[in-house]
Amino acid sequence: MVAQEQQKPFVIGLDLGGTNSVFGIVDQRGNILTTNSIKTQAYKTAEDFVSAGVEALKPIIAKVGGIEQIKAMGIGAPNGNYYRGTIEFAPNVPWGHDGVIPLADMFSEKLGIPVGLTNDANAAAIGEMQYGVARGMKNFIMITLGTGVGSGIVVDGHMVYGSDGFAGELGHTIIR
């Protein structure tokens, strides 16, 4: 089973934004092979969003040889909780204020592959640490600005998630 898993050369990435959500298939070197997108704001429920996302994934998965070529999926999302694989009370996603949404499990059920989820700024920091300008850096902060504002904090080469999974959520900071 392990040898079979290692032969799967691609992963799916989802950058879930408050306005648009972009799906991509990436190889082991971080090269984006193909993408598709949907309007995040077009869906009233998480279930509708996941169904539309799976439909958007079908043609790009087919381009790389089918789901059997996909090892896993990673999601970067506002208010994403790495520990739980959930989006929690996300005000900048139409269906996000419904409470705690088990988005990783929802996609995993539909696709039949493992799915991980983290805060979108943390995902950006991890990407920069592995493939971008933060390669080799042990300590840095990645600031993101889109529909919301966030940060991914890296200390001693490790992502800081905090005790509850929400370290770096700058958009929820009260400044007086």
PLM regions with names:
Residues 2, 8, 26, 34-37, ...:
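Glycine/GP-enriched mid-protein hinge/lid loop-to-helix segment characteristic of carbohydrate kinases
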Residues 15:
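Conserved catalytic-loop position in the HRD/HxD motif
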Residues 19, 31:
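Conserved Rossmann-like nucleotide-cofactor binding loop
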Residues 32-69, 99:
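N-terminal phosphate-binding loop and adjacent alpha-helix
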Residues 46-54, 69-73, 79-139:
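Glycine-rich phosphate-binding loop and adjoining helix at the ATP-binding site
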Residues 78-81, 146-148:
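Short glycine-rich anion-binding loops that position phosphate/pyrophosphate groups of nucleotides
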